[in-house]
């Protein structure tokens, strides 16, 4: 009798994705982040569901409903901080996952990569709307500043902003719709992640060498199931440590003040994971130019496969490209730091130089260096 897992209509999908899936024998821990992102998404959906049971999306009661969750609901504080810090863990895993893709040339799988870029946008949109929900000072002013950016779009800008607001300012209508979208988007993200996996399994995983691994494959289970479980345990350890020891480490103290449209906080800034993009936005003195740079800072990932000039897929055997990759990482860390600083000298010029370097590295320097490396190998 054939094994049920190989014949049952539902089980065989699971079997071909997580059990009998042929996987390269040499994939490193950098390949763990896909499963970690799946775990993060499940944590966020579950904690979010329980938060939604007690949250009210009304300007008058939103802030106090979050206070009520933290004070009166059984383990409400735990659920709330798991959700808030879970978002941070989600973005750490996302950035490492994308970084892995850039380093090892995983972007050569075009469909998988493009859906990944779409997923990144969806997660960023979800996180932004979630940050508005507690209706603290930074929630309100963050929503005002970011939605206002759309007014830079020629001709339809101001109408578009008022349409998104549902009025003439960020108010009850805005909060209600943001809650609705924040609730539905994670399920759309889950569906997209399924498509992301579907396309990945069409080609099979890449590996650190960037060479075809068809000659040397091993089953996903038990080798990579065990490896993924180790990764998940480390993720949960990091998340629970953050939640139980310093839950407010990554948050903004201004968000413990209820939203007040009459009082602007001295420094409006988003959560840490948006700071690099915020720094790029602020480094351009023109509003429309800033908005375009902000969108392009993420959308540039979709162009990366077309800028691949090397004859090798991975950076494993390309020392000059490796150096540039780590300069890019350092540049992004610099942008993250600048995004959290006030708009004054010397931060303005540092931010502008870091923004120029970011685009130059990806669009010009790295492709030219790849060509130079080809010549070194006489290819």
From Swiss-Prot:
Keyword vocabulary terms for this entry: Electron transport, Heme, Iron, Membrane, Metal-binding, Mitochondrion, Mitochondrion inner membrane, Respiratory chain, Transmembrane, Transmembrane helix, Transport, Ubiquinone
Membrane topology summary: Multi-pass membrane protein
Protein name in UniProt: Cytochrome b
Binding site for heme b b562: 83, 182
Disulfide cysteine pairs (residue numbers): none
Entry's cofactor comment: Binds 2 heme b groups non-covalently.
Example GO biological process: mitochondrial electron transport, ubiquinol to cytochrome c
UniProt subunit comment: The cytochrome bc1 complex contains 11 subunits: 3 respiratory subunits (MT-CYB, CYC1 and UQCRFS1), 2 core proteins (UQCRC1 and UQCRC2) and 6 low-molecular weight proteins (UQCRH/QCR6, UQCRB/QCR7, UQCRQ/QCR8, UQCR10/QCR9, UQCR11/QCR10 and a cleavage product of UQCRFS1). This cytochrome bc1 complex then forms a dimer.
GO MF annotations in UniProt: metal ion binding; ubiquinol-cytochrome-c reductase activity
Superkingdom of origin organism: Eukaryota
One GO CC annotation: respiratory chain complex III
Pfam family, one: Cytochrome_B
Family named by the database record: Belongs to the cytochrome b family.
Binding site for a ubiquinone: 201
Residues that span the membrane, as ranges: 33-53, 77-98, 113-133, 178-198, 226-246, 288-308, 320-340, 347-367
UniProt: heme b b566 binding residues: 97, 196
Locations listed in the record: Mitochondrion inner membrane
Other comment: Heme 1 (or BL or b562) is low-potential and absorbs at about 562 nm, and heme 2 (or BH or b566) is high-potential and absorbs at about 566 nm.
The protein's required cofactors: heme b
Record function comment: Component of the ubiquinol-cytochrome c reductase complex (complex III or cytochrome b-c1 complex) that is part of the mitochondrial respiratory chain. The b-c1 complex mediates electron transfer from ubiquinol to cytochrome c. Contributes to the generation of a proton gradient across the mitochondrial membrane that is then used for ATP synthesis.
InterPro entries attached to this UniProt entry: Cyt_b/b6_C, Cyt_b/b6_C_sf, Cyt_b/b6_N, Cytb/b6-like_sf, Cytochrome_b, Cytochrome_b_C_euk/bac, Cytochrome_b_N_euk/bac, Di-haem_cyt_TM
Native source species: Sorex daphaenodon
